[in-house]
Each structure stands twice: as C-alpha cells, then as structure tokens.
Amino acid sequence: MKTAPVGFDAPQSSDESVDAFIDTLWLEEGLSRNTLEAYRRDLNQLRAHRQGASLFLCGEADLLAYFSAQHATTKATTANRRLTVFKRFFRWALREGRIHADPTLKLQAAKQALRVPKSLSEAQVEALLAAPDVSTALGVRDRTMLELMYASGLRVSELVDLKTLNLGLNDNVLRVLGKGAKERLVPFGEVASQWLRQYLSGARAELLGGKQTDDLFVTTKGMHAGSAMSRVMFWMVVKKYALAAGIRSALSPHTLRHAFATHLLNHGADLRAVQLLLGHADISTTTIYTHVARERLAQLHAAHHPRG
C-alpha cells in the first residue's frame, strides 16, 4: 500500500524530518558539522514557535508570523540566514514528495545594511603576534597559530581542523578543506613557515606528551589534552593576547582573517586573488573588504595630502 506524504496524515515526526534533511545535506554536500548544527538549530526554533507542530504543515502565513514575532530581537542578517535554511528545507520536502507546495516561494530576504568587518591596523597585528611568551611550548603554539592565520587568511574552523598532512613546508602551501567540502591550496609566507618548523621541531611533541595524533594544533587542557584545538579555545587565545597587546577595539575570532584581506588590498592585491585565497564562492563577499581598504586610503589622504 502506498504511504501518504508526510504532513497530511503525518506518519513521521517533525524531529525525524529535520534529521532526514540534515542527513541529506551531509551525504550530498558534505557540509561541516558546525553548519549542519546551525541548520538544525534554526529548524528546531521554528518548530518551537509552532509548539512542536510538524514543519510539513507549515504554510506561508505561519512563516510570516514567525518572522514577525522575531523581528524586534533579530538582526536582518540572522533573519535572512534562517530564511535561507527554511527555503532549503522546504525545497527538499517538495522534492521528496512530503509537501505539495513550497511555503517559502514568495518570501523575500530582509534588507540589511552593509556590515564592514572589523580589522586591525598593521601595527596592532604586529603587537598581537608578538604577545605570546615563546620561551614556552604553549607560547610557540599560540604564536604559530596567530602567524599562520594572518599569513593565510584561513577561517578559524579551517585553522583548528588542520592536520600535519595538510602542510607543504617545502613550498609553503596549505591544503585546506573549506565550506562545502571544497579543497583549495593556500600559500603562506616565510615567517609563518619558520614558526611552523619551530613548533613541529619540539613544542608540539612537548604538548602531546607522548600521545599520537595527526592534528596540527593540539591542546593541553584537562581530559582533552593532546586533542585538536577547538574554535572556542582559539578565540580565547586571541582575546588573551589582544588584551596583553593593549588592543581595546572590538574583536572577533576572524579578526586576523579580516586583517589578512584588508592589508592585502591596502597593498594593491587583486580582488579576485583575495577571493581565491579566502575561499569565497561569490566575489561580492570579498568586495566588503574594499570598503575597509577605502577607509584606510581616505585616512592616508587626509593625513598626508597638503589640502587634506
């Protein structure tokens, strides 16, 4: 006997439908665990708003009511991200025959102001990089991570996920698995290469304490000692050394990635080249950094032009 589509007599719970959708994304697109969990959270929040009712019974009016309820406390960027997740979910449900129509079809993204990434000056970056105590193994690890991120522009998740096999020290290149499981080759400079060699020649083994792993950057914290650094751990590293360097401006885990892109553009790098280095699928994402670079050029003009 043919089974009726879910959402009409709902033989499958909404929890299971979210799981099935997440499994499909993982199998077909190889999205990262962090991305998949973010999708799950957004869908579960919609379920909570609907008091646990099946998402397959959700109509356009229900979605409009959800976004209206969220409007006062949610940024446009967050609302648009959630709408993107919902559109993907309902397109999947339609494709699988679970619903007859896509309730997101007529919904449009909210207008949002251009958010320019916060960046550090070159002097601030130098102070940040010099902050770790490199007479210790932990300090060498931290200095190496900071140097490599500034030299390569990696995402934090890409940095902490690096394996020793991803390193090409002979030609100073990293093999990185980025968003959507897309692999790219990322060059880095001689200074970062020297710190990597110093870290690998002694500090890493000291931190591992006899353990074996192919994770490049390892932690010494409690029960996780000898395992890979997490994004949260690296964020704590950045905040710790920013404080030591006297940096009081607002920071984010990607501060050095933003500085990498901005400083390249300030020194005349081609926008397309920066796009490839950052691993952006769309150049419009990279274009945001040109606004930071223009601000810097305007400051230089005002400071040095005789009629500035």
Region locations from a protein language model:
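Conserved catalytic core of the tyrosine transesterase superfamily
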Residues: 1-308
